[in-house]
Curated annotation (Swiss-Prot):
Gene3D superfamilies: Glycoside hydrolase, family 7, domain
Pfam family, one: Glyco_hydro_7
GO biological process per UniProt: cellulose catabolic process
Gene field: cbhA
Active site per UniProt: E227, E232
High-level lineage: Eukaryota, Fungi, Dikarya, Ascomycota, Pezizomycotina
Annotated signal peptide: 1-17
Function: The biological conversion of cellulose to glucose generally requires three types of hydrolytic enzymes: (1) Endoglucanases which cut internal beta-1,4-glucosidic bonds; (2) Exocellobiohydrolases that cut the disaccharide cellobiose from the non-reducing end of the cellulose polymer chain; (3) Beta-1,4-glucosidases which hydrolyze the cellobiose and other short cello-oligosaccharides to glucose.
Major enzyme class: hydrolase
CC annotations in GO: extracellular region
Protein species of origin: Aspergillus terreus (strain NIH 2624 / FGSC A1156)
Protein name: Probable 1,4-beta-D-glucan cellobiohydrolase A
Keyword set includes Glycoprotein: yes
């Protein structure tokens, strides 16, 4: 009787699970990267990338009927979260023709618009091709080349880490049968509520279709975790930003208690949605980054980020660039009361004061809390536009109605309106970002140069 009960329980669990489809074979585009040692020798690693489950075709398990079309759910297949998870399956992806994602050796190119698809988000897979590659960052550095020359105002070619589960949530949430192979388990410091599935269950209950994004909406739950933005950038502006959370791993939140971009009360949640950012333009150094500037976005650049600390305790995040064989130190702050060119606890406190921003960063653990979360982080690469604020927080003046002469308001040279999603999707569908030559290792091991600028 006990064995029969266990069997029945297992069958019920499978029926209610988030399913993986079989109509399209899932083949991850290969992407190599390098792991380096203290002496500067680097070994090639055979990885691949997988697209996030939110972009995938979601259809009935017993056929090919869409469970989700545009930004609405099929009510018969998805009357509630549990039934939807049982009735619907994520399927394999055609990376190039559907999503504009291509790889070649160590290079990954993401195209902004391909057919009806807008933007993409991919994760680096481990060599087993079943789990995400993870990185222990404190005491190490992470380096990559990037070409942002074809990323205009309003777009963001991002490279960042979050504390996603390496298996996509399969072991924590048995209802998730798709796992990392199908790009499940996303979370970040905005506690995003636009995810179709969280913790193996659908997010249909309370779903409200977006009024300005034909492909998205907001559900009743969000998925939270610490986020380390190494690179949020286009050809005009760039920023790197740590975002700590109260919990070190992925957690689910409900409604506006999630906070972040998707909720009425931005600071209601357990994560810091603002972070402590370093944007050279915002820090008053307006001639540093951009076309024909010190870091020239007309050309490929090498981006080096160092995580200073030991024993898991993070004390500083440093940035430098290599371009045309020369190492370029990060821009110095030109803001009164804020000194330095790296992210430290003192820098963050001084910056919040100078800009008149709420110090939500310290409330959720600050730099120390960020360091606590920086083991086994998952690498994410994406291209996207911003239906909330048109990327003005990155490359324009923000808030939109603020005086651009006030400290911290000007973040770049883009005019208001040019980054509107409708504008960039119609005028710049062929925009691209290319990431290549990813390297990871002890500090000083991943880059070299002929001279220092």
């Amino acid at each position: 009787m006990h064995q029969r009960a266990l069997l029945f329980s297992a069958l019920v669990g499978a029926v209610r699970a988030q399913q993986a489809g079989t109509l399209t074979e899932e083949v991850h585009p290969p992407l190599t990267w390098q792991k380096c040692t203290a002496d500067g020798s680097c070994t090639e690693q055979s990885g691949s990338v997988v697209i996030d489950s939110n972009w995938r075709w979601l259809h009935s398990t017993n056929g090919s009927t869409n469970c989700y079309t545009g930004n609405t759910w099929d009510e018969s297949l998805c009357p509630d979260n549990e039934a939807c998870a049982a009735n619907c399956a994520l399927d394999g992806a055609d990376y190039e023709s559907t999503y504009g994602i291509t790889t070649s050796g160590d290079a990954l190119t993401l195209t902004f618009v391909t057919g009806e698809n807008v933007g993409s988000r991919v994760y680096l897979m481990a060599e087993d091709d079943e789990s995400y590659q993870t990185f222990d960052l404190v005491g190490n550095e992470f380096t990559f080349d990037v070409d942002v020359s074809n990323l205009p105002c309003g777009l963001n070619g991002a490279l960042y880490f979050t504390s996603m589960d390496a298996d996509g949530g399969v072991s924590k949430y048995p209802a998730n049968k798709a796992g990392a192979k199908y790009g499940t388990g996303y979370c970040d410091s905005q506690c995003p509520r636009d995810l179709k599935f969280i913790n193996g269950m659908a997010n249909v209950e309370g779903w409200t279709p977006s009024d300005n994004d034909k492909n998205a909406g907001v559900g009743g739950h969000g998925s939270c975790c610490p986020e380390l933005d190494i690179w949020e950038a286009n050809s005009i502006s760039s920023a790197f930003t740590p975002h700590p959370c109260d919990d070190l791993g992925q957690t689910m939140c409900s409604g506006d208690d999630c906070g972040g971009t998707y909720s009425e009360t931005r600071y209601a949640g357990t994560c810091d949605p603002d972070g402590c950012d370093f944007n050279a333009y915002r820090m008053g150094n307006t001639s540093y980054y951009g076309p024909d500037k010190i870091v020239d976005t007309n050309s490929v650049m090498t981006v080096v980020t160092q995580f200073i600390g030991d024993g898991g305790s993070l004390s500083e995040i440093k940035r430098l660039y290599v371009q045309n064989g020369k190492v370029i130190a990060n821009a110095q702050s030109n803001v009164d009361g804020v000194t330095g060119n790296s992210i430290t606890s003192d820098f963050c406190t001084a910056q919040k004061t100078a800009f008149g921003d709420q110090d939500i960063f310290s409330k959720h653990g600050g730099l120390s809390g960020m360091g606590d979360a920086m083991s086994a982080m998952v690498l994410i690469l994406s291209i996207w536009d911003d239906h909330n604020s048109s990327m003005m927080w990155l490359d324009s003046t923000y808030p939109e109605d603020a005086d651009a002469s006030e400290p911290g308001v000007a973040r770049g040279t883009c005019e208001h309106g040019v980054g509107d999603p409708e504008t960039v999707e119609s005028q710049h569908p062929g925009a691209t970002v290319t990431f290549s030559k990813i390297k990871f290792g002890p500090i000083g091991s991943t880059y070299s140069s002929n001279s220092t600028a």
